[in-house]
Amino acid sequence: KYMEMWKAAGIKVAPVVSGAALARRLEQAGADLLIAEGCESGGHIGELTTMALVPQVVDAVQLPGVAAGGIADSRQLLAAFALGAVGAQLGTCLLVSEECPIHANYKEAVLKARDNSTTVTGRIAGAPVRILKNAMTRDYLKLEKSGAELLELEKFTLGGLRRAVFDGDVQRGSLMAGQVAGLLKEIKPLRQIFEELMAGLPAVAQGLTDKKII
């Protein structure tokens, strides 16, 4: 019912999908383009990686596909195009932009992250979320493994994102971030982030041309 309302209002609709079946249903419902988001992403995720998901989605539908999850530099952006995407949705690398209005502690936590600094909570509850590891995630995962009921798990995480974004609580807050956090080393203006992404594409493409395939 929402799709019809949005389309009637002239709104372009770009749903996020985590699988080919959902992509086909949303195409039939009238979506204008689809965002194929892999499980490398921060926040709520599916189970397929971007590498596996994007080509399956673009092969399943006639709509343009946008890749999301695990994209923070020119190498990853070019890979998204190679997988069949017409563009990319960025998330984690924009958290550490100057313009992003999250708490400075949140940004600092993202910049300190390594390749193994994220974890996924909520799988047992049926709502997996990728976030940075902290005291809250350790306690939550213990609670989850103990067989706690869904309502108890929901109460445990209530207000977690607010604590991260507004209060800067890096131990009890829900610091949503993707696996590319380990690539991010400094806070930059949005303009610089996008300019560097695009400026690096020719060199990456040339590197592929020059590379000897063994």
What are these regions (language model features)?
Residues 1-66, 73-92, 171:
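Alpha/beta enzyme core
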Residues 52-66, 72-214:
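Conserved active-site-proximal phosphate/metal-binding subdomains
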